[in-house]
């Protein structure tokens, strides 16, 4: 069990089914110390309004010893790597995940997909690329991993990709993990929970990491401190409430 989960959705994304309170309760039950709420960016049809993300500033940082990070799963919009998280939204959030979603950026050829993903990483606004192993969006995995290491962006291994969505991701995710290993980059594990019951579920991710002998010291989820140091290295101000996590 890893004590950090970096990817989940609440009822604010209306195809998800749990509240912030549900996730806090499940985190306490499972021993999760820190998690990030990452509802879909506003360009998705059922995503929350941009005010939702700006107003996350009213959330407490800690509830019953569980740390809450304010995040988003933004959409990569075009080959220039623009995302639907700008201005006050960027300044209000701790964790910016970005990825491809068909309603916003339709699948293209490998070269175009790769260009868009690398441009998003190069923008300096993205901390994690979500589900880069999605077979609907072929990319040059070696180039993506090298760019991620260069720009200090983590590539996600997404547990949901092996269970509920993006079927056929296994080979790509294995290749992503191996390429990140070779490039000396970071991986982030995400449950991609759309219900609190799956918070912190990484069993399928763990299989992929084991198969490629991925170094544990390059997994962001190992401890709250490791993740927070990574985010601080990318410009996030230290969060005093998390000092004892």
Swiss-Prot record:
Pfam families: PHP
Residues the entry annotates as binding Zn(2+) 2: 15, 40, 194
One Gene Ontology cellular component: cytosol
Intrachain S-S bonds: none
Alphabetized SUPFAM superfamilies for the sequence: PHP domain-like (SSF89550)
Keyword presence, Metal-binding: yes
An individual GO BP term: bacterial-type flagellum-dependent swarming motility
E.C. numbers: 3.1.3.-
Listed cofactors: Zn(2+)
Keyword Ligase belongs to the record: no
Record: residues binding Zn(2+) 1: 7, 9, 73, 192
Cofactor note: Binds 3 Zn(2+) ions per subunit.
GO molecular function, one term: phosphatase activity
Record-stated family: Belongs to the PHP family.
UniProt-listed HAMAP family: YcdX_phosphat (MF_01561)
Self-association state and partner proteins as the record states: Homotrimer.
UniProt protein name: Probable phosphatase CKO_02035
Native organism taxonomy: Bacteria, Pseudomonadati, Pseudomonadota, Gammaproteobacteria, Enterobacterales
